[in-house]
């Protein structure tokens, strides 16, 4: 008899969880409180339903080849970065192709998820739901929580002196959908993440003036890398290796040099404050808006008056009509009881960011409570692949006593300042994917691949680390993975080839010969080094802190 699994939420992580359950012959039932799937990707003109959804102008920050389900590539005619409508179309195609919609109960709210009295033996859960006023109770062998990390807006008004005196409109970015209501107004956007940058840019087209306040500053990345390819496509295993062995000071220096060569961040009021951790956003239009005066950069807010804002640098902006806080979200699991509710909000103590450490049976998985320097969709899919195999007993995790001891020790060390709280840090995409797929048995062996299939191995190691790599071997192997990898550049270029242009001949340079003849020798040398456990121990001991590998191409000096 198939084990029954409750999946809470039908967004990107909920859809992948349903599919992963079916792949492992589990019986999923998905509960979705709205009338449609897609979660925040299902656009709505208003925020009356209290749901966090995309705003109208949103465009994806991760290109299509790096942000698809691992056995379901985007169609080749899809743009590399797409509107929310296009992305939702992809989710619909995925759900229909694998027959996922029949497992979703729409307009159903999960009220409570509690352990059954015999949980220590069975690992089962009581799940109480409500559909249009009617309550239901059911028993499940496992639960996958796929509600994401954008449920409850974080609006720390108490941190802003004088905010109670301000007479203008105050809202959180969760309430923002379309700019029409803000025409001709003077607007302050507080917070410079991806959302803050996007909203400031969109409002600058119709507002009288937009002010963008940031405490720390940020590095601003473009969606295209040198040469015009999607910047995510430089996220390779080769660069991942380099970032592990190069000195951090060199990486920091070259990174700052490269970023400021593209855009002098200090001149634009964007540079990172001294002592602050580097932060990145993706925004192609923000520098232009600043250059044209449509967006004015400001320091952090010091005080509010009835209609003005005073900033830390002593400047004042008067006649402010609207303040939009883009201050993030708080994690929330209202259907759990304590202490499980609190434990699940602490990402750093979840085992591999998935399993709570205090359960005798590993039958509860938190899917999607992660921050990555890559696609969250891909990360949630591999979390779900691993979790469903744990449910079936095909993969194991350490006993709860050991996990709780490690979690307690970690929290104590953080409180004492011995180690840093990294719960808000973005995980390295390739490292985390490798870690999860190593547990599954789906991580490709690069040396073995070079022996069996050199052409494929070359693309896997030096090309973009696309999700298809984790379908080449092991459980969940997909016959189309090899072809998907070898044709990923074709799908990248296809939507750009809308005008036939005659090719101009390119002279063969010395660099081409060096690449052709020197690269194989270099690769063999690196693989030998890579396999040296002593070398890896030395590297890991000496170089504890690294930037995300896919940034490295931006750090490296280039000849003009």
From Swiss-Prot:
One of its GO terms (molecular function) is NADP binding. Pfam families: FMO-like. SUPFAM superfamilies: FAD/NAD(P)-binding domain (SSF51905). Its cofactor is FAD. It is found in: Microsome membrane; Endoplasmic reticulum membrane. Its EC number is 1.14.13.8. It is a single-pass membrane protein. It is an enzyme of class 1 (oxidoreductase). GO terms for biological process: energy homeostasis; negative regulation of fatty acid oxidation; xenobiotic catabolic process. This protein is involved in the oxidative metabolism of a variety of xenobiotics such as drugs and pesticides. PANTHER family: DIMETHYLANILINE MONOOXYGENASE. Belongs to the FMO family. This is Dimethylaniline monooxygenase [N-oxide-forming] 4. It comes from Mus musculus (Mouse).
């Amino acid at each position: 008899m198939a084990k029954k699994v409750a999946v809470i939420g039908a967004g990107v992580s909920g859809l992948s969880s349903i599919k992963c359950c079916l792949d492992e012959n589990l019986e999923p039932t998905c509960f979705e409180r709205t009338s449609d799937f897609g979660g925040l990707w299902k656009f709505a003109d208003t925020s009356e339903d209290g749901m966090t959804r995309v705003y109208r102008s949103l465009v994806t920050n991760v290109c299509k080849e790096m942000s698809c389900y691992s056995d379901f590539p985007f169609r080749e005619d899809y743009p590399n970065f797409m509107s929310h409508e296009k992305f939702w179309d992809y989710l619909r195609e995925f759900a229909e192709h694998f027959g996922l919609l029949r497992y979703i109960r729409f307009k159903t709210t999960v009220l409570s998820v509690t352990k059954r009295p015999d949980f220590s033996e069975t690992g089962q859960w009581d799940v109480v739901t409500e559909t249009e006023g009617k309550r239901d109770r059911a028993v499940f062998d496992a639960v996958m929580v796929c509600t994401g990390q954008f449920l409850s807006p974080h609006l720390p008004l108490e941190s802003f002196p004088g905010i109670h005196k301000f007479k203008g409109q105050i809202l959180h970015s969760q309430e923002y959908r379309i700019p029409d209501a803000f025409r001709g107004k003077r607007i302050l956007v507080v917070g410079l993440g991806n959302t803050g940058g996007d909203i400031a840019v969109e409002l600058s087209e119709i507002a009288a003036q937009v002010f963008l306040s940031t405490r720390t500053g940020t590095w601003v990345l473009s969606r295209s890398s040198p040469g015009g390819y999607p910047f995510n496509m430089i996220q390779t295993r080769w660069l991942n290796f380099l970032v592990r062995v190069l000195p951090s000071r060199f990486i920091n220096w070259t990174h700052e040099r490269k970023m400021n060569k593209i855009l002098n961040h200090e001149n634009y009021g964007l540079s990172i404050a001294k002592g602050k951790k580097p932060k990145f956003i993706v925004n192609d239009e923000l520098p232009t808006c600043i250059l044209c005066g449509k967006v004015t950069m400001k320091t952090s807010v010091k005080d509010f008056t009835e209609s003005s804002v005073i900033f830390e640098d002593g400047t004042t902006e008067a006649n402010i009509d609207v303040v939009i806080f883009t201050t993030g979200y708080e994690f929330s699991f209202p259907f759990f009881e304590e202490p499980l509710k609190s434990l699940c909000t602490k990402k750093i103590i979840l085992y591999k960011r998935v399993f709570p450490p205090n359960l005798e049976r590993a039958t509860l998985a938190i899917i999607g409570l992660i921050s990555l320097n890559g696609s969250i969709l891909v990360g949630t899919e591999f979390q779900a692949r691993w979790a469903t195999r744990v449910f079936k007993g095909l993969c194991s995790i350490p006993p709860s006593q050991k996990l709780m001891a490690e979690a307690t020790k970690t929290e104590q060390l953080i409180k004492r300042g011995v180690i840093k709280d990294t719960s808000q840090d973005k995980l390295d995409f390739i490292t985390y994917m490798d870690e999860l797929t190593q547990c599954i048995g789906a991580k490709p062996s690069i040396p073995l691949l070079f022996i069996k299939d050199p052409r494929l191995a070359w693309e896997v190691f030096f090309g973009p680390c696309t999700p298809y790599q984790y379908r080449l071997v092991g459980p969940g192997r997909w016959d189309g993975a090899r072809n998907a990898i070898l044709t990923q550049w074709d799908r990248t270029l296809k939507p750009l080839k809308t005008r036939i242009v005659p090719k101009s001949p390119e002279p063969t340079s010395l660099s081409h010969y060096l690449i052709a003849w020197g690269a194989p020798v270099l690769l063999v040398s690196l693989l030998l080094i890579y396999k040296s456990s002593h070398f890896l121990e030395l590297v890991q001991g000496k170089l504890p802190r690294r930037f995300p590998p896919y940034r490295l191409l931006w750090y490296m000096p280039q000849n003009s």
